Swiss-Prot record:
Species this chain originates from: Orientia tsutsugamushi (strain Ikeda) (Rickettsia tsutsugamushi)
UniProt name for this protein: Serine hydroxymethyltransferase
Origin: domain of life: Bacteria
EC number(s) from the headed UniProt entry: 2.1.2.1
Functional note: Catalyzes the reversible interconversion of serine and glycine with tetrahydrofolate (THF) serving as the one-carbon carrier. This reaction serves as the major source of one-carbon groups required for the biosynthesis of purines, thymidylate, methionine, and other important biomolecules. Also exhibits THF-independent aldolase activity toward beta-hydroxyamino acids, producing glycine and aldehydes, via a retro-aldol mechanism.
Upper taxonomic lineage: Bacteria, Pseudomonadati, Pseudomonadota, Alphaproteobacteria, Rickettsiales
Length: 426
């Protein structure tokens, strides 16, 4: 291996091992998944579908893809699946290509309320090719406002309604979305990229009986390789989806990744996986309560899934400051725009925290109480320093210098905790 790359991988392994990973969209996949991704399957071109390839020598490739499809259909209890999308974004784009025409109207959640870029955000292809209308969460409860969704649907008559989010911590009523979609004759797309693991284990209701199409990533709570998938119970839609993925969106599928997806689906079908998802949710609730008890505003008052959103507007702390200084202390998270946020997306007014990765390492409730204390200690000290400066401008570097001893002390404790939960042995 190239020494430079080897050294960088070693450094990244050390970073992952020695830090607390709280980015809600990240996880630690199994060695089996990684072995499949690094296998000789990466050598094979396989444009097309099972028994309909444009290259020879695909007899074993067909079996690999067939296994992945069978396992994901069993996992989500659906009739049709496409496992070829390279990402969740491309899965969504394939749905648009299959069901929409340029200029059609789509209705989805506003980015600041927790929606995703691929749901019609202006910088994204979905916002450039389609007329995107967005609904928001309720200004008081920060919950989905189903009345507003229906009002906008009746007003704009979208061709497609999207449900599913990247920053929403409560359960989704797919049945209500189905009723709204039916009233205006719209397709319903459920993007379950974040909650796929909860849906697979029935800790969250499934959109399969309600949505025309379901998309997801295969990493995040599913703990698989980075990739996408598309599910449906409608045969005619499945044919359109297949054509949209290939030849519409992609060329040759990544067979080494599809093999890794099959392994991840197999792992998710095991009883231990349901126990894992339950622990993910317990850990998220404990972390949310600890931060609430320390005086921090958790949007919606808690969480029903794997993530929580910490609104820092009342503490005079930006998401950028929190992310940077927590990272300095060995705690990785991401700054997050809050509903009705007036700051830049590069600054933000809060952070998003997730429990899947550390739960994979073996963290339980008591460990997350400890983690929550570390987070609150850092945030408390940021607030104290900024309060002392009153209205004076202060840079993140200046805050970091003032917090040097606190950051150093916290980082030592973080590393001690992480050493008790190795990611990969041997």
């Amino acid at each position: 291996m190239c020494k430079e790359i080897y050294d960088l991988i070693a450094k990244e392994l050390y970073r992952q091992q020695s830090t607390i990973e709280l980015i809600a969209s990240e996880n630690f996949t199994s060695k089996a998944v990684m072995l499949a991704q690094g296998s000789i399957l990466t050598n094979k071109y396989a444009e097309g579908y099972i028994n309909k390839r444009y290259y020879g020598g695909c007899e074993f490739i067909d079996e690999v893809e067939s296994l992945a499809i069978d396992k994901v259909k069993k996992l989500f209890k659906c009739n049709y699946a496409n496992v070829q999308p390279h990402s969740g974004s491309q899965a969504n784009q394939a749905v648009f290509l299959a069901l929409l025409k340029p200029g059609d109207t789509i209705l989805a959640m506003d980015l600041n309320s927790g929606g995703h870029l691929t749901h019609g955000a202006k910088p994204n292809l979905s916002g450039k090719f389609f007329n995107a209308v967005h609904y928001c969460v309720n200004k008081d409860s920060y919950l989905i406002d189903y009345n507003e969704v229906e009002m906008l649907a009746q007003q704009h008559k979208p061709k497609l309604i999207i449900v599913g989010y990247s920053a929403y911590s409560r359960k989704i009523n797919f049945a209500t979305f189905k009723e709204i979609a039916d009233k205006v004759g719209a397709y319903l797309l459920a993007d379950i990229a974040h909650i796929a693991g909860l849906v697979a284990t029935e800790y969250h209701s499934s959109p399969i009986p309600y949505a025309h199409v379901v998309t997801s990533t295969t990493h995040k709570t599913l703990r698989g390789p980075r990739g996408g998938l598309i599910l449906t119970n409608d045969e005619s839609i499945s044919k359109k989806i297949n054509s949209a993925v290939f030849p519409g969106m992609q060329g040759g599928p990544l067979m080494h990744v599809i093999a890794a997806k099959a392994i991840a689906f197999s792992e998710a079908l095991m009883p231990q996986y349901k126990e894992y998802i339950n622990q993910v949710m317990l850990n998220a609730k404990v972390l949310a309560k600890l931060l609430q008890d320390r005086g921090y505003n958790i949007l919606t008052g808690g969480t029903d899934n794997h993530m929580l959103l910490v609104d820092l507007r009342g503490k005079n702390i930006t998401g950028q400051e929190a992310e940077y200084l927590l990272d300095a202390a060995g705690i990785t998270c991401n700054k997050q725009v809050m509903p009705f946020d007036t700051t830049s997306p590069t600054i933000t007014s809060g952070i998003r925290l997730g429990t899947p990765a550390c739960t994979t390492r073996g963290f339980k409730e008591n460990d997350f109480i400890t983690v929550g204390k570390y987070i609150a200690d850092i945030l408390d000290n940021i607030a104290i320093i900024k309060s002392a400066k009153k209205n004076e401008d202060i840079t993140i570097t200046e805050i970091e210098n003032s917090l040097d001893s606190v950051i150093t002390h916290t980082k030592q404790h973080v590393q001690e905790l992480c050493n008790s939960f190795p990611i990969y042995t041997n």
